[in-house]
């Protein structure tokens, strides 16, 4: 909801920072998969309601759930100093999930040609949000919150 108020950095449809993912990836590493999933589901539903675009729930859920599954698996192999890695890989799978939904909803497999553009933006956004989550995690850990 907050991110919708920020002007797009690039004039490409579907490309955004994914600031809400900072909270989800942070929650996954700080509190575990269940809490991260709850946060993901609530923010997707609330975002769709407040944006007034109910169809976005399908794209957001597909991308978010695929991202969540992958990052839950990665969490088993990564330390809390590698949150950014999970975020980057999760962003890639988030984009794959969204493209798959777009193909199903439109019946146009040719949409897959848009995937490389989304991959580049997803990797950059995933790196940014992952570094933010990792920074937050480190600061709160130093304050004795974990």
How should each PLM-predicted stretch be described?
Residues 1-27:
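Hydrophobic transmembrane alpha-helices
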Residues 3, 7, 28, 39, ...:
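Alpha-helical transmembrane segments and their lipid-water interface positions
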Residues 4, 28-29, 48, 72, ...:
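Transmembrane helix-loop junction
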Residues 19-33, 70-74:
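Generic transmembrane alpha-helix motif of multi-pass integral membrane proteins
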Residues 34-76:
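Helix-adjacent hinge/juxtasegments
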Residues 53, 57-58, 76-146:
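Membrane-embedded alpha-helical hairpins and interfacial helices in multi-pass inner-membrane proteins
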